[in-house]
Amino acid sequence: MNINATLLGQAISFALFVWFCMKYVWPPLMKAIEERQKKIADGLQAAERAAKDLDLAQANASDQLKEAKRTATEIIEQANKRKSQILDEAREEAQAERQKILAQAEAELEAERNRARDDLRKQVATLAVAGAEKILERSIDKDAQKDILDNITAKL
């Protein structure tokens, strides 16, 4: 194998070509490759962050759902307590009203009894005076009759 000028020219041309590629072609290619690697790495990191954010959001949503359920349960319990309280108050008011009505009815009944007794006493006294008049066959004047009726009424 002879080393001649052609081979030497080709070697120099190849060296210039390699130098030119290393100086002007290789850096933009490496820069493009590095940018592409960086974009891919950033995309992977973003995907990991998104997955973590999704997990965090799901956990947060689960916590909020649990809190909402707990709050709803508390509200329902409070409503049930309030319902029971209102029902108890209504029962107490109804019982008090019942007692009041019964007391009024008893008072009215007692007043009616007393009035009926007084009327009955007066009638008995009048009948007694009438019977006594017939027995005595004489008339008693009005003042004496009134005194006798008052005495009999007071004694009954």
UniProtKB/Swiss-Prot annotation:
Chain ranges passing through the membrane: 7-29
Entries under SUPFAM superfamilies matching the protein: F1F0 ATP synthase subunit B, membrane domain
Heme recorded as keyword: no
GO CC terms of this entry: plasma membrane; proton-transporting ATP synthase complex
GO molecular function per UniProt: proton-transporting ATP synthase activity, rotational mechanism; proton-transporting ATPase activity, rotational mechanism
InterPro entries listed in its UniProt record: ATP_synth_B-like_membr_sf, ATP_synth_b/b'su_bac/chlpt, ATP_synth_F0_bsu_bac, ATP_synthase_B_chain
Keywords per UniProt: ATP synthesis, Cell inner membrane, Cell membrane, CF(0), Hydrogen ion transport, Ion transport, Membrane, Transmembrane, Transmembrane helix, Transport
Pfam families on file: ATP-synt_B
Membrane topology: Single-pass membrane protein
Keyword Membrane on entry: yes
Gene3D superfamilies registered for this protein in UniProt: 6.10.250.1580
Location of this chain's protein in the cell: Cell inner membrane
Superkingdom of origin: Bacteria
Subunit structure comment from the entry: F-type ATPases have 2 components, F(1) - the catalytic core - and F(0) - the membrane proton channel. F(1) has five subunits: alpha(3), beta(3), gamma(1), delta(1), epsilon(1). F(0) has three main subunits: a(1), b(2) and c(10-14). The alpha and beta chains form an alternating ring which encloses part of the gamma chain. F(1) is attached to F(0) by a central stalk formed by the gamma and epsilon chains, while a peripheral stalk is formed by the delta and b chains.
Family named by the database record: Belongs to the ATPase B chain family.
Protein name: ATP synthase subunit b
Organism annotation: Vibrio alginolyticus
Gene: atpF
